[in-house]
Amino acid sequence: MTRVKSKLDEELSSPWFYTVCTMGGMLSAGTTHLAITPLDVLKVNMQVNPVKYNSIPSGFSTLLREHGHSYLWRGWSGKLLGYGVQGGCRFGLYEYFKTLYSDVLPNHNRTSIYFLSSASAQIFADMALCPFEAIKVRVQTQPMFAKGLLDGFPRVYRSEGLAGFHRGLFPLWCRNLPFSMVMFSTFEQSVEFIYQKIIQKRKQDCSKAQQLGVTCLAGYTAGAVGTIISNPADVVLSSLYNNKAKNVLQAVRNIGFVGLFTRSLPVRITIVGPVITLQWFFYDAIKVLSGFPTSGGVKKPVDAAKLSV
């Protein structure tokens, strides 16, 4: 048993495993974000102009009436490529840092490992995403700005230089770091809870279909909780990109405390919950097809008295 466990640990820290995780993250994040581009267009416009776009049904009606169906897919290339790159870094580096921190911090509890791993991965993931996000938000809210990435990148560079591509990096970190930390930790804890308290079986004793079902349930829970935590920074980010405010402090004053937590929250939950669920499902399905177990658990559980999932 020890030899089998040791062999599995070696496989889960191999270059091939991290490659699979990175590719799985790219495919799952890029495709799911592409699929919900119309909702994202509505969300960004609700954040920038909440009076005009004050609900999901009326917001869609206004966009369709004024701009047509094609407008709902503006920024699709930024969604596909930007969030694909971000997803590869987020998932691939999370697995790497989780193994690393489990080895160098053996006496810390698992929640600390999840927080540190997800935060470390997200820092690099957002640095990769930021240039794409800078173009995407402008394309979605400023009809005359550009059609997509090809003409959007040169325009930002001419008007703002390289700094324009990373103008929103700090608020992006403020949005995504709490989201990622809460999302990954909630996912891991949810997986453990489902196996121990609901199914009451070890992961390896469940079928692959059951394991993927657990992944979906834990993924939706993680996405919903993370959305609420990250909503204020998401609203501020849209305000900055559309020149509604010169800095974060001014944006917060303009939006108001209540608005930070409520503006566009319903549409964000509508978007993020299913998206995170599908991301985890596709991600774990790719891992299973590659011969690896589904996600959940650390390499070296700190509390040996409990079953590791």
Swiss-Prot record:
Membrane-traversing stretches: 16-36, 75-94, 112-132, 168-187, 209-229, 269-289
Domain of life here? Eukaryota
Q: Does the keyword Secreted apply?
A: no
Task: Tell me which Gene Ontology terms the entry assigns under biological process.
Answer: mitochondrial phosphate ion transmembrane transport; response to salt stress
Residue spans of the Solcar repeats:
16-100, 109-193, 210-289
- Family recorded in the similarity comment: Belongs to the mitochondrial carrier (TC 2.A.29) family.
**Function text:** Transport of phosphate groups from the cytosol to the mitochondrial matrix. Mediates salt stress tolerance through an ATP-dependent pathway and via modulation of the gibberellin metabolism.
Q: What is this protein called?
A: Mitochondrial phosphate carrier protein 1, mitochondrial
Source species of the chain: Arabidopsis thaliana (Mouse-ear cress)
